[in-house]
A protein has these predicted regions:
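Sec-dependent N-terminal signal peptides
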Residues: 1-6
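C-terminal motif of bacterial Sec signal peptides marking the signal peptidase cleavage site
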Residues: 10-13
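C-terminal and inter-domain tail/linker signature
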Residues: 16-305
Length: 305
């Protein structure tokens, strides 16, 4: 073998070795997605463990010490910022409610946010409350919190509870999550800010719509009828959509409409379930009227970052 031929053979072998040692872009992409999925599951575990320890374990101080960050920004209007605010505000409620039980029904995560729906009761047989929470997690600690709370009424316009139905779904591509999130926001914008409930339903609600809001019957027609009188709203009075959390077939949306007096207004946290065509087929929510002042000085919807 000549020297040039040997050199060529050596270069070819080195090239092959380098190619085999360099991860392909698809392998790298899969690894990144897996790491992101692991982080989302870790964040969900932090939040659910915190919730269980504080509310069902009744160990409020221990939950705060273990899971809350050095900076904890509170948007629940009755509690102050910080772990101390959580312990004094929420701890007092837990202590005064010996029969308290919180059943977590749905948990979703996206980015650094974890959204949670639960059914909280104060005694056996109590209708209880629908509680929707959003937590922001940073380096394994909870650093910010928003919520919406609604009493479960005695009667409902539909045969469903505020909590039943599917609780999870297979994971979806980022493109599907982005599409469903955009559709949820467009639906709310059309219905509540533009006064176009019929258009919102025609474009974005599937032929079968299961409703868990106790004020509405099942189906798109009931929704359109209930919102038929809404006038377009702009400016400061328009409904805001501060944050969303999408996972699987579900999109969790926070809303807030100011009344114009301090921090007062009406807000909700909604869960929409979508079909494969990006149409809404199921809906859960909690709706709350918020006061004009808060214990923390924060609004119930803004972002402390």
């Amino acid at each position: 073998m000549t020297v040039p031929a040997a050199a060529a053979l050596l270069l070819t072998a080195c090239s092959n070795d380098a190619e085999s040692a360099t991860p392909s872009s698809s392998t790298t992409s899969t690894s990144v997605v897996a790491e992101q999925g692991d982080q989302l599951e870790s964040n969900k575990t932090v939040v659910t463990d915190f919730y269980e320890l504080a509310f069902n374990g009744r160990q409020v101080q221990q939950a705060a010490d273990r899971y809350l960050g050095d900076v904890y920004i509170q948007h629940n209007p009755t509690a102050a910022d910080g772990a101390a605010g959580f312990v004094s505000g929420i701890g007092g409620y837990v202590e005064a409610t010996p029969g308290l039980h919180a059943e977590i029904t749905r948990v979703f995560a996206e980015g650094d946010l974890v959204a949670l729906q639960s059914h909280t009761t104060s005694a056996p047989g109590d209708r209880g409350q629908a509680v929707f929470d959003i937590f922001r997690v940073d380096n394994g600690k909870i650093v910010e919190h928003w919520d919406a709370i609604q009493d479960v009424p005695e009667t409902s316009a539909n045969p469903n509870t505020m909590f039943d139905g599917p609780t999870s779904s297979p994971s979806k591509s980022s493109e599907v999550l982005e599409r469903n999130t955009a559709n949820a926001l467009t639906f709310l914008q059309l219905a509540f800010n533009e006064g176009k409930a019929a258009e919102a339903a025609d474009q974005l609600v599937g032929p079968t719509d299961t409703q868990h809001n106790p004020s509405f019957a099942d189906g798109k027609d009931a929704f359109v009828t209930a919102l038929a009188g809404i006038e377009p709203v702009t400016g400061d009075k328009a409904t805001k959509f501060p944050r969303t959390v999408a996972e699987g077939d579900f999109v969790f949306v926070q809303t807030f409409a100011s009344s114009g007096e301090g921090t007062a207004g009406s807000g909700s946290m909604d869960i929409f379930r979508f079909d494969e065509n990006g149409k809404i087929v199921e809906h859960w929510d909690a709706v709350q009227d918020y006061p004009s002042t808060t214990a923390s000085g924060n609004t119930v919807w803004d972002d402390g970052r």
